[in-house]
């Protein structure tokens, strides 16, 4: 199965099953999970990047533990709508995950400003220290990304 656009992704999903959202960074991958009705996204975990095979194994274990059947990967588009180097890296992640699980539904979601928005909320509304923000911002950004995709899926 190729990486899908959001409409084909919706068609590939069973009626009730969780989906995970990923916010891949240079050193970590933020992971969020939806409920089985795909209404609410919640931050789940932070995977410290090591080797792709180990990272993928950890991701698949998280997915299995939550009954997740598909992945939404954040795509950090430039403000003008073009794709930069990080987009290429995230697209490669999607392709590599499909090599391990060819039938896994995967789509991308524009994550522009997700990390900045989450950081602003953590500072303005929760007064969280920089150290604590660094620990939670990626998985919260994954939740932000996944929630955006879930809202789009509900509109289809």
UniProtKB/Swiss-Prot annotation:
Nuclease found in the keyword field: yes
GO CC terms: cytosol
The keyword Endoplasmic reticulum belongs to this UniProt entry's keyword annotation: no
Alphabetically ordered keywords of this record: Cytoplasm, Hydrolase, Nuclease, Ribosome biogenesis
Main location, first listed in the record: cytoplasm
GO biological process per UniProt: rRNA 5'-end processing
NCBIfam families, per database record: RNAse_H_YqgF (TIGR00250)
Family statement drawn from the similarity comment of this UniProt entry: Belongs to the YqgF nuclease family.
Protein name: Putative pre-16S rRNA nuclease
Source organism: Caulobacter vibrioides (strain NA1000 / CB15N) (Caulobacter crescentus)
Taxon lineage: Bacteria, Pseudomonadati, Pseudomonadota, Alphaproteobacteria, Caulobacterales
């Amino acid at each position: 199965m190729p990486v899908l656009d959001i409409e084909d992704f919706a068609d590939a999903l069973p009626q009730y099953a969780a989906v995970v959202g990923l916010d891949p960074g240079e050193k970590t991958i933020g992971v969020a999970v939806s409920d089985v009705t795909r209404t609410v996204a919640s931050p789940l975990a932070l995977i410290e990047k090591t080797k792709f095979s180990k990272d993928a194994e950890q991701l698949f274990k998280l997915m299995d533990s939550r009954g997740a059947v598909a992945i939404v990967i954040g795509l950090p588009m430039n403000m003008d709508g073009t794709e930069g180097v990080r987009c290429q890296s995230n697209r490669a992640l999607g392709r590599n995950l499909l090599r391990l699980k060819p039938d896994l539904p995967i789509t991308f979601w524009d994550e522009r400003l997700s990390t900045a928005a989450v950081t602003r909320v953590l500072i303005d509304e929760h007064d969280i220290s920089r150290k604590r923000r660094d620990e939670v911002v990626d998985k919260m950004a994954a939740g932000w990304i996944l929630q955006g995709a879930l809202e789009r899926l509900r509109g289809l």
